[in-house]
């Protein structure tokens, strides 16, 4: 794809175009759910989404902003069935939802968030995010999950949806490489029991530090919102309660940081006992 408009390629030059208004409306959860789509912005994020098997319905690109590498991504999206639409800079700046846009935005089918569709491997490691409010934290946890080979990330009683553009952005596209689901606390607890997952609750009130806990075998690590922590339901059902040792004045860490520390302690232990080997982990 070149910077010159190709024959038959749709081009939109007006920010008031009805189609552009529809894209902007997808920032709202209700509109995304009704259309069963979400937005992915950014060259790196769209490349990862395509590599993970995502198939965009449409891709909007601005040649002035994206450069040659972005045009190759647009070509790749087109080869995978996406309608590619060229837009002017003012149009792209209207549909963009982040600072410093690089001229690529895709509309993709909504992710399945059905708990029953999650398939777990032997000795699965699962992350459960209970009542998390901030999309940025969910996205950051997805990046950790992808890097650590986590089997799934489950949102229990979610405040936001997986299709929130800020979740997608903070995940750097890894939301398309890690299975996700959403359900009520009761449903997630029942699902964990069905799959014989030991529940480990992360709480600053725990007496046991994470390095002293056995984090091998089928395991679900539960983290809660920073202000309220895990609910009584999680604390009562947890087989283990663990904390991260703190030596300063603060009594807790950002939830995504906590999730990363605990997850990598679990990975360390699994590598040590042979549940993972370096090659499998790196995949």
Language-model regions: role of each:
Residues 1-74, 159-161, 281-283:
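Boundary-proximal intrinsically disordered activation/regulatory segments immediately upstream
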Residues 12, 38, 130-131, 156-157, ...:
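Glycine- and other small-residue-rich loops at beta-strand/loop junctions that grip anionic moieties
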Residues 43, 64-66, 111, 204-207, ...:
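Short glycine-rich anion-binding loops that position phosphate/pyrophosphate groups of nucleotides
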Residues 44, 51, 79, 85-90, ...:
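RNA substrate-binding interface of SAM-dependent RNA methyltransferases
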Residues 74-107:
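Glycine/small-residue-rich loop that forms an oxyanion/phosphate-binding "nest" at active or ligand-binding sites
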Residues 106, 144-148, 159-174, 232-283:
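Structured adenosyl-cofactor binding patch, chiefly the S-adenosyl-L-methionine
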Residues 200-248, 254:
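Active-site/ligand-binding-proximal alpha/beta "capping" segment
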């Amino acid at each position: 794809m070149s910077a010159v408009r190709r024959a038959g390629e749709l081009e939109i030059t007006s920010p008031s175009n009805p189609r552009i208004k529809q894209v902007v409306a997808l920032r709202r959860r209700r509109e995304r759910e009704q259309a069963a789509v979400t937005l992915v912005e950014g060259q790196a994020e769209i490349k990862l989404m395509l590599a993970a098997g995502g198939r965009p319905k449409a891709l909007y690109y601005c040649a002035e902003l994206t450069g040659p590498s972005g045009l190759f991504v647009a070509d790749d999206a087109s080869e995978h069935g996406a309608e590619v639409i060229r837009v002017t800079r003012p149009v792209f700046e209207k549909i963009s939802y982040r600072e410093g846009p690089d001229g690529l935005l895709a509309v993709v089918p909504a992710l399945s968030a059905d708990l029953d569709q999650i398939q777990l491997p032997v000795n699965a490691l699962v992350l459960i995010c209970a009542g998390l409010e901030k999309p940025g934290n969910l996205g950051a946890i997805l990046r950790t999950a992808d890097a650590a080979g986590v089997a799934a990330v489950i949102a229990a009683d979610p405040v936001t949806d997986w299709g929130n553009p800020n979740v997608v952005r903070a995940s750097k596209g890894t939301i398309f490489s890690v299975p996700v689901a959403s359900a009520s606390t009761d449903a997630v607890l029942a699902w964990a029991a069905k799959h014989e997952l030991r529940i480990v609750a992360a709480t600053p009130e725990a007496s046991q530090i994470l390095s002293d806990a056995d984090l091998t075998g089928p395991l679900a690590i539960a983290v809660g919102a920073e202000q309220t922590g895990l609910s009584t339901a999680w604390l009562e059902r947890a087989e283990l309660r663990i904390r991260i040792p703190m030596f300063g004045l603060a009594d807790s860490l950002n939830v995504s940081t906590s999730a990363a520390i605990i997850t990598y302690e679990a990975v360390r232990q699994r590598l040590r006992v042979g549940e993972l080997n370096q090659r499998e982990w790196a995949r």
